[in-house]
UniProtKB/Swiss-Prot annotation, chain A:
Alphabetical UniProt keywords: ATP synthesis, CF(0), Hydrogen ion transport, Ion transport, Lipid-binding, Membrane, Transmembrane, Transmembrane helix, Transport
Locations listed in the record: Cellular chromatophore membrane
Chief subcellular location: membrane
UniProt similarity note: Belongs to the ATPase C chain family.
Site (Reversibly protonated during proton transport): E61
InterPro entries named in the record: ATP_synth_csu_bac/chlpt (IPR005953), ATP_synth_F0_csu (IPR000454), ATP_synth_F0_csu_sf (IPR038662), ATPase_proteolipid_c-like_dom (IPR002379), F/V-ATP_Csub_sf (IPR035921)
Protein known as: ATP synthase subunit c
Annotated organism of origin: Rhodobacter capsulatus (Rhodopseudomonas capsulata)
PANTHER family tied to this protein: ATP SYNTHASE LIPID-BINDING PROTEIN, MITOCHONDRIAL, ATPASE PROTEIN 9
Length: 78, 254, 186
């Protein structure tokens, strides 16, 4: 019985952790959206900043991956 | 279990990441495993592309040779742009990492394949190697001046100690995020495809399968396309972050 | 659905995947017993890739790229040279053309003056001939005219004498000729 409650908590926690991915999605969208709006204003500078955009995406996405990892840990490792 | 037997739905999203010995038996540190197999297939593919493909040394390249040259030029330019001219000395190391990651990622997309880069042990080792060598290099090149990386001289004096603490923490989190980003991305994509794949045979067991099975097959196709993109982008991101860290070590003065 | 199934699995903890996974700590990534194995083989792999790249692939690609760069810049230099040559040739051609044109102009002028000279000579000769002929003609015309006048006078005098005789007069030769002379000249 005790184990069941722990399991339940872990699964609920896993589900909650998944909401973090939404934040990552917002972040990545924000980065790319701003990049595109900037690129449309000044297309000649866009090519040189693509690498910066990918770094930004990577940083924003990493946090979503962390929440996914927490969910996985709760589901399989706790 | 009874329900599982009834519907036939089996979820093993972690199944493709399991490591097992190729020839049976315990997994010791020297045992050839499926990870070994796929790493060696990666080596084989790299040699096919870069050694067999370029054996013509043609001035006007064949298709394979031009792919190899394209990859070379891509990473070479990245290192030069991000880390500067003096970073080119470390180009072979960075190119090795890039090739290993990109081939592991793409070969892992083959059905039934194993993806070495989805394991924290693999990405963690690479990230730690980058972290340690970059830190050592920074101290060797700049001496104590490397610590200037943490002392943000453009900020107001009162804020600098606080910023220094934050910078130090973010510096030491680098290998963690560096490794987990790659492993997590690889793992997430494969696990999601695995979950969709588990839904696919539903049509054999239940009426709602008529609606669910085509949807899940479509979802797998879409995820696969996304994973193709992710496989490349993550290799690119790992490499470019390595270049950024290298630049910090070579030119710590921001 | 995934959670549910897995919950059932895990809770039941029967033999099979879930129990095995639970034994191993769930995620294969966190199964630390496989870490030495992966680290060892990863090191081997990376060293092999590094060795292959630095020994064979990278020098080869770098040399091919350098060769290509050399070929391209060599070709460009050759093209530049050819361009200069073409420019020289063009200049020479233009010079030859203008020379030829000047020569032609000269020849034309010479020819024209020669022709003009000939023409002038011919014209002068023709003029002289014409003048001579004209003089001759005028002379002969004057002769003819004089002859004719004479004839007219003599005919007129004879006719007048005949007419006078016919009218029953006596022909005075001297008076008649004076009268005819006066009439004809008149």
């Amino acid at each position: 019985m005790e184990g069941d409650i722990v399991q339940m908590g872990a699964y609920i926690g896993a589900g909650l952790a998944c909401t973090g991915m939404g934040g990552a999605a917002v972040g990545v969208g924000h980065v790319v959206g701003n990049f595109i709006s900037g690129a449309l204003r000044n297309p000649s500078a866009a090519a040189s900043q693509t690498a910066t955009m990918f770094i930004g995406i990577a940083f924003a996405e990493a946090l979503g991956i962390f929440s996914f990892l927490v969910a996985l840990l709760l589901m399989f490792a706790v | 279990m009874a329900e599982e037997a009834g519907t036939g739905l089996v979820f093993h999203p972690m199944e493709p990441f399991k490591i097992h010995s190729l020839f049976g038996g315990e997994v010791h540190w020297y045992t050839p495993t499926n990870a070994t197999l796929w790493m060696f297939i990666g080596i084989l593919a790299i040699s096919l592309l870069f050694i067999v493909g370029t054996r013509g040394r043609a001035i006007v390249p064949s298709r394979v040779q031009s792919v190899a040259e394209l990859a070379y030029g891509f990473v070479h330019k990245m290192v030069e742009d991000v880390a500067g001219k003096d970073g080119l000395k470390y180009f072979p190391y960075i190119f090795t990492l890039f090739l290993f990651i990109v081939f592991a990622n793409f070969l892992g997309l083959i059905p039934m394949a194993f993806t070495p880069t989805s394991h924290i042990a693999v990405t963690g080792l690479m990230a730690m190697a980058v972290f340690i060598s970059v830190t050592v290099l920074g101290f060797m090149k700049n001496g104590a001046g490397f610590l200037g990386l943490f002392w943000v001289s453009s900020a107001p004096l009162a804020l600098r100690p606080l910023l220094a603490v934050i910078e130090v923490i973010s510096y030491f989190v680098r290998p963690v995020s560096h490794s987990i980003r790659l492993a997590g991305n690889m793992m997430a994509g494969h696990a999601v495809m695995e979950v969709f794949a588990a839904f696919a045979p539903l049509i054999l067991f239940s009426a709602i399968g008529i609606a669910v099975t085509p949807l899940s097959v479509l979802a797998i196709v879409a995820m696969y396309a996304l994973e193709m993109l992710v496989a490349f982008v993550q290799a690119y991101v790992f490499t470019i972050l390595t270049c950024v860290y290298l630049k910090d070590a070579l030119h710590p003065g921001h | 659905m995934a959670n549910e199934t897995h919950a059932v699995d895990a809770a039941a903890a029967v033999a099979g995947h879930a129990a095995e996974a639970a034994e191993k700590g769930g995620m294969p990534q966190l199964d630390f017993s496989t870490f030495p194995n992966q680290i060892f083989w990863l090191t081997v792999t990376l060293v092999v890739i590094y060795w292959l790249l630095t020994r064979i692939a990278l020098p080869r690609i770098a040399s091919v790229l350098a060769d290509r760069q050399g070929t391209i810049s060599g070709d460009l230099a050759a093209a530049e040279e050819y361009k200069l040559k073409a420019k020289d040739a063009e200049a020479a051609y233009a010079k030859a053309l203008s020379d030829a044109r000047a020569q032609a102009q000269k020849i034309i002028a010479e020819t024209r003056s020669e022709i003009q000279k000939e023409l002038d000579a011919a014209t002068a000769k023709a003029d002289a001939e014409i003048a001579e002929r004209l003089a001759q003609s005028e002379e002969s015309i004057a002769e003819i005219r004089a002859g004719a006048l004479e004839a007219v006078q003599s005919v007129a005098a004879e006719t007048a004498a005949e007419i006078v005789v016919a009218l029953g007069g006596k022909a005075d030769k001297a008076a008649l000729s004076t009268a005819v002379d006066a009439r004809v000249k008149g």
